Amino acid sequence: MIQKDLILLLLICLTIISCRTPRFVYSPAPPNNPYFRERGESKLAAYYSTGADANELTNEYNNGFDLQGAYAVSDHFALTADYFKRSEKDGIYEDNRTYFDTSLVRYKRRLTSIGAGYFTPITNDRKITMNIYGGLGFGKYSFSDDGFDNGAGYHRDYSSDMTKWYIQPSINFFVGNYFRTGLISKVSWVRFNDIETSYTSAELSYLDLDRLPGRTLRFFEATWNVQVSFRNKNWFYLDGGFTFSSDPFVNDDTNLEARNFNASIGISLDLSKINRKNNEQ
């Protein structure tokens, strides 16, 4: 009898935990990973990004764009800059949660970062390079939450300033004249400040959002990036990749989560090669 009661209690606890739907505090982006080998090389890139978790039946989406630039100021050092923007929507339809039976959560994220890094070939033919970059970014994270709670409509807002800093080691491979690929890892620290919200204290505690003010969360990301160029267009690259992100590393059990996947496709230009080609002519 006692064993059956323990099993029932465990099932109830699991049900309560599983129904505590998260509010996602982080979304990954394609890393700014230049394929530099010498001074004067440049990068100007634009990407369409998606979390690949859209649902047409519930009109959910997760997409945005990324802009990136970089310039090699010497044969081993470079400067970077990038801009990130996301729009996301989650539909949550459950009637057995403590708060918010039905929710439509719409996220907005934006971040501007600058950075610097070191790159060097590690083979005599310069077909493999090692790189390490770091940077600092500032941005905004916000969402609106609309739905029904015990049959009554509700609306909540949440917004926070973000400060992000990161370190990003990578290895790039140059395969032939028109193909190159990179394996990139990234550790990011994100701090949330100046939070404004219309959630009650009990609701913030239920969603674990009361843990965010003044707290720095750490995330790990891994990316595979591919660039393809064309004959007589070696300054132009089709650029795409997949990024996987961890949830935040915390010492206690929490409902704070990250979007765990991002796919990106776009173009990358090296304007220095256009100038070099014109000078040769």
Range-by-range predicted roles:
Residues 19-72, 78-79, 270-272, 280-281:
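Short glycine/proline- and aromatic-enriched beta-strand/turn motifs that initiate or cap beta-hairpins
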Residues 38-42, 59-65, 85, 106-112, ...:
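Residues that define the transmembrane beta-barrel architecture of outer-membrane proteins
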Residues 44-46, 69, 79-81, 114-116, ...:
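Membrane-embedded beta-strand positions of outer-membrane beta-barrel proteins
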Residues 58-120, 135-138:
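Glycine- and aromatic-enriched membrane insertion/assembly motifs of diderm outer-membrane
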Residues 75-81, 123-129, 177-181, 191, ...:
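Repeated loop/turn-to-beta-strand initiation elements of outer-membrane beta-barrel proteins
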